Amino acid sequence: QTIKFPLTFKKSQYSNSEKANWSEKKLADSGYGQGDILVNPIHMASIYSAFANNGSMVKPYIEYENGKTEILKQDVFTAETANTIKNDLIQVVENPEGTANDMKVPGVTIAGKTGTAELKNSSTDTQSGTLGWFDCFTVNYSNGNDMLIIGMVENTQNNSSGGSHYVIKKIKSLFVK
């Protein structure tokens, strides 16, 4: 779906070709972010907003001050499914074994997901970089002023702790002074 937004960004896609050719391998690869699916950060924010809002996607906006929240698409997930995903995403941060446990902030409930996307042109490509992602949102934060934050940084292939952990440090600094 096209999202009207005051900034220009690349369109999200399901496939590198006009007609998706979904082999079992390509479907599995896409499930963990290594297939043809490409999602821009604005679209990713809208998807995550559905987990925070009982299944409804919020229309993205830039908040200069007192932004107005509008629903982009109602009930893209059932409230039950959205809450299950939200609780799982909270465990990614809260559980000591979670991939984003470094994001845990005392007194703040944060739901999040780490990710690293490879930019390889082929299975033998060793020169292309990676993208480190961290997508998160607060739950019942600061008098109902919840935040959804999408962070992505390029060329994280030399980060020994994974690309998303660089992003986590930056986002956590918004909560810890």
Q: Which residues does each PLM region occupy?
A:
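Glycine-rich loops and low-complexity Gly/Arg-rich segments
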Residues: 56-57, 160-161, 173-177
